[in-house]
Amino acid sequence: MSFLKKAKGSIISDAFMLKEKHANLEENLMYDVALYEDYLNIKFCFGKQEAKLNYNQITDVFYGMETEIKAEEKSSIGRALAGGVLFGGVGAIVGAVSGAGTKQKKERHFYFIISYISSNNEEKIIQFEDTRLYRGSKVAKKLKELCNLKVEEKVEL
């Protein structure tokens, strides 16, 4: 398990949440993704389920962010209380009215996706969410190197 350190004998590892059920791996559980000399190992952090992929099976690796904008209701009660404390009855009314409506909230999700060719010669993907934001991007970059996939360089403008 690599919650704070790499898996024993691995080059690098990190824990990710699996987004979709995949073979014997259950969704929404944490899995340790560990890179070894010639294969990738995916192991349930608190059990025995695991899967292995040889690097020559892997066709693409993606690590990136998605921003989701959600609408949230404003708290008219909280604003009414604050207005009432500061400015009395009129402040409470103004606070309650200003609290009506919605506000936008941004949620950022970081994804680690591995495309590969299965033993049945089918194209498949394994999608993880990087909920810890610890070493996810480093694992993805190292996996690209080990699979001889093009590593994208960051360009700043």
Q: Model-predicted segments: where are they?
A:
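Acidic, Ser/Thr- and proline-rich intrinsically disordered linker/docking segments
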Residues: S2-K5, V61-L157
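Anionic N-terminal interaction surfaces
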Residues: M1-Y39, C45-A51
